[in-house]
């Protein structure tokens, strides 16, 4: 197996059974904040343009580069698709021209043309942009695990695919914390030191658990070339900086008694066999070392090459074109109204300072209104041009744009609250309902509601929509109006697919008069479903809003039981 490192998390894997292009990233990301480090400007893109397979682990822009994928990768390529509950990644890939997809199941190996592959998918709201994944590859001679920046939880599943000969993984920071927070200097230093230590220790723990013979640090760090962010770079191995480079992690591994790490830079080619891993760099060894020992000089030259590009991107941001308050009120309030568990998790005010516009997201009243100095738990200060951009383009995941850009300031009172950031990545009804359903399923008791003489599970078995809000019942058929999936109340049978089932239970006649409303375990009254427009109870045999078509997929066999 031959593996060309193409920068950041990017790999081009060549085997006798075919090639796989993984997470290619070339263009700046997050409002021109992130650039690949070291630079991959000299990669010959034509050599990686015709892979047999493409693997994009998730939708973060340092992994999913739509401009590169659209302009440089053959659309005859088959995409290896992770098992995500929402089809956001597939939609993004279709938007740039891909039409051939191999859909995988989480943790289930598949053999294609002599290659044995497995994608391990993480699907919690906190996992990437509602999904992150790693790829295991076995070419019959050696096995590798491309973890990139995913955080797998089922390590036994990964072990069953192994043992592994090589392991590619993230070790460095990929977040805005703590730099954007307005902390005192000593506190900032302590938090940065703790974050850096935790990153390195977590990566080392993963290497021990996976147990690969060879370890290659990847998926970071990026570099920051805009003057506004330039100080975030770790120029001198600062123990308080959250962006240590590859050489820092390799030294850390050696200090912990693990000398099996290998440095790869863009253009490096590794040849992996059962007897070793030989890396050839695209430049002399002393030049490779200089990238890291003279990082200030290297980044100064890199910055000079990108200065005009950064200026052009910043000049393109809209300014004064959008009524921010009115737009966010129209956009956010319907979402907040449906975000019962998210709102309960936030349980406070979030203030957004957008220059002349200062507004409150009030998760008590589920309203958006001008800020008049009220107390808050979270405070964000944004360049209003960035918020205008997000509104103009109706960006449904702000984490994947403005937050990862690090182009903001923040304050918070108390501990980190994941519900706040998860709300900002769920700015569509589909995304929000998935997150709400995920939270609900983690509750100790599954909530039921009552309608038309039945007790019914509250969350749709398809993508977890809240059926107390999105169900329409007619002629004994419940239709989830979010995606159009239908279920027979008498049996719970799904009429759209034969691999899902809705829990239903008839209510005894003597109970129905007393049960005018269902009550949640926390005491909140569940409302009856809102009336939804319908054309009748005609049966749909597919989902019209996502990729799922049951006619294309056989019924799944039951498996044995077995920030910051």
Language-model features and meaning:
Residues 82-142, 244, 251, 260-265, ...:
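Metallo-beta-lactamase
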Residues 65, 439-561:
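Rieske [2Fe-2S] iron-sulfur-binding domain
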Residues 33-80, 160-190, 399, 474-479, ...:
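Active-site metal-binding motif and surrounding structural segment of the metallo-beta-lactamase
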Residues 16-59, 66-71, 127, 151-163, ...:
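Pre-active-site segment of Zn-dependent metallo-hydrolases
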Residues 78, 155-257:
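Cap/insert and terminal regions of metallo-dependent hydrolase folds
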Residues 1-41, 429-445:
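Zn-dependent metallo-beta-lactamase
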Residues 270-459, 465-472, 478:
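Feature captures hydrophobic
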Residues 28-29, 34, 119-140, 150, ...:
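Active-site-proximal loop/helix segment associated with metal-binding centers of metalloenzymes
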């Amino acid at each position: 197996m031959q593996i060309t490192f193409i920068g950041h998390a990017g790999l081009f894997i060549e085997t006798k059974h075919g090639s796989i292009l993984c997470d290619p990233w070339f263009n700046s990301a997050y409002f021109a904040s992130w650039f690949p480090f070291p630079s991959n400007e000299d990669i010959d893109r034509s050599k990686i343009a015709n892979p047999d397979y493409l693997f994009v682990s998730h939708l973060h822009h340092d992994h999913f580069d739509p401009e590169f994928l659209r302009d440089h990768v053959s659309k005859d390529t088959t995409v290896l698709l992770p098992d995500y509950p929402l089809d956001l990644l597939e939609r993004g890939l279709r938007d740039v021209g891909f039409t051939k997809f191999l859909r995988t199941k989480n943790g289930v190996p598949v053999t294609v043309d002599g290659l044995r592959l497995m994608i391990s998918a993480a699907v919690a709201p906190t996992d990437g942009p509602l999904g992150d994944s790693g790829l295991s590859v076995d070419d019959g001679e050696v096995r590798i695990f491309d973890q990139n920046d995913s955080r797998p939880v089922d390590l036994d599943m990964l072990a069953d695919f192994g043992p592994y000969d090589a392991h590619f993984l993230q070790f460095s920071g990929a977040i805005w914390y703590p730099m954007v927070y307005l902390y005192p200097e000593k506190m900032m230093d302590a938090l940065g030191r703790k974050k850096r230590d935790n990153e390195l220790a977590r990566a080392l723990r993963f290497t021990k658990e996976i147990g690969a013979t060879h370890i290659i640090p990847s998926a970071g760090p990026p570099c920051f070339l805009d003057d506004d962010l330039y100080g975030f770079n770790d120029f001198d191995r600062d123990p308080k900086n959250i962006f240590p480079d590859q050489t820092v992690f390799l030294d850390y591994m050696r200090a912990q008694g693990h000398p099996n790490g290998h440095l790869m830079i863009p253009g490096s080619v590794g040849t992996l066999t059962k007897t070793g891993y030989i890396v050839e760099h695209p430049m002399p060894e002393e030049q490779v070392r200089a990238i890291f020992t003279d990082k200030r000089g290297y980044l100064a030259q890199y910055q000079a090459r990108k200065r005009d590009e950064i200026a052009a991107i910043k000049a393109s941001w809209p300014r004064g074109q959008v009524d921010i308050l009115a737009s966010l009120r129209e956009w956010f309030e319907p979402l907040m109204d449906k975000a019962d568990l998210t709102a309960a998790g936030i349980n406070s005010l979030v203030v957004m300072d957008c220059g002349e516009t200062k507004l409150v997201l009030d998760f008590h009243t589920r309203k958006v209104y001008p800020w008049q100095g009220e107390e808050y738990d979270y405070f964000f200060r944004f360049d209003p041009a960035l918020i205008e951009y997000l509104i103009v383009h109706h960006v449904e995941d702000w984490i994947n744009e403005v937050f990862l850009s690090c182009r903001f300031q923040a304050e918070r009172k108390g501990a980190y609250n994941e519900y706040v950031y998860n709300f900002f990545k769920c700015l569509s009804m589909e995304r929000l309902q998935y997150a709400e359903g995920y939270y609900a399923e983690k509750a100790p008791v599954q909530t039921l509601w009552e309608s038309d003489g039945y007790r019914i599970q509250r969350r749709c078995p398809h993508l977890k929509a809240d059926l107390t809000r999105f169900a329409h019942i007619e002629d004994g058929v419940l239709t989830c109006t979010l995606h159009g999936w239908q279920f027979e109340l008498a049996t719970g049978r799904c009429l759209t697919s034969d691999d899902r089932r809705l829990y239903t239970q008839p209510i005894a006649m003597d109970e129905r008069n007393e049960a005018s409303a269902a009550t949640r375990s926390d005491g909140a009254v569940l409302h009856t479903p809102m009336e939804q427009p319908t054309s009748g109870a005609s049966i749909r045999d597919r989902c019209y809003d996502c990729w799922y078509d049951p006619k294309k997929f056989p019924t799944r066999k039951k498996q044995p039981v077995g920030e910051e």
